[in-house]
């Protein structure tokens, strides 16, 4: 299972669906995207909607090391977009991937950012932007001189955040 933008493996929707799947007898793995769920210290990179390689690597690892050959992926919002992207990229080269479910995937991330910039969606943009700025500050503490924190004070939209 892959969470959405600014979520983590412990997000309420992830826990709820994982619990239901577990109770039906399925094995469940809840993945954190890079830098999410308290993993900022593990890599100097920031996550983004193009990082689908991580999920293909996890599926290959589960097949090779754990002998799992009937794997389904589920992703929410940005996580849904990422697993759809991954499936298109691996297209049959990861035979253990049997299928996937994408819940409310943001198929067009640029259009999603544009929608978030509308005045009616100010709350959501503010929520995401506040979270992303906090994430960069946490990363900067682990990787000094990698991020210019002075730029954060001038960022007021997600588009500006992406551009810097």
Predicted regions and their residues:
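Glycine-rich, phosphate-binding/catalytic loops in enzymes
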Residues: 16-19, 46, 90, 117-119
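Catalytic nucleophile-loop/oxyanion-hole region of alpha/beta-hydrolase
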Residues: 20, 34-72
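The conserved beta1-alpha1 loop
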Residues: 2-4
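Short, hydrophobic alpha-helix immediately C-terminal to the catalytic nucleophile
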Residues: 15, 19, 56, 84-88
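Short coil/turn segments at secondary-structure boundaries
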Residues: 12-14, 41-44, 114-115
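Alpha/beta-hydrolase-fold enzymes
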Residues: 66-164
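Conserved alpha/beta-hydrolase
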Residues: 7-10, 18-42
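Alpha-helix N-cap/helix-initiation motif
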Residues: 6, 10, 44-48, 98
């Amino acid at each position: 299972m892959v969470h959405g933008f600014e979520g983590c493996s412990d997000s309420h929707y992830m826990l709820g669906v994982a619990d239901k799947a577990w109770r039906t007898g399925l094995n469940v793995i809840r993945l954190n995207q890079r830098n999410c769920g308290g993993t900022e210290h593990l890599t100097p990179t920031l996550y983004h909607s193009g990082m689908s390689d991580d999920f293909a690597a996890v599926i290959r690892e589960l097949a090779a090391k754990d002998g799992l050959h009937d794997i389904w992926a589920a992703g929410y919002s940005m996580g849904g977009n990422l697993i759809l992207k991954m499936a298109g990229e691996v297209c049959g080269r990861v035979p253990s991937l049997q299928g996937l479910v994408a819940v409310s995937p943001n198929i067009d991330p640029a259009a999603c950012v544009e929608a978030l910039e509308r005045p009616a969606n100010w709350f959501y943009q503010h929520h995401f932007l506040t979270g992303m700025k906090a994430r960069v500050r946490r990363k900067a503490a682990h990787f000094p001189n990698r991020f210019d924190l002075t730029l954060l004070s001038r960022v007021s939209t997600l588009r500006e955040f992406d551009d810097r």
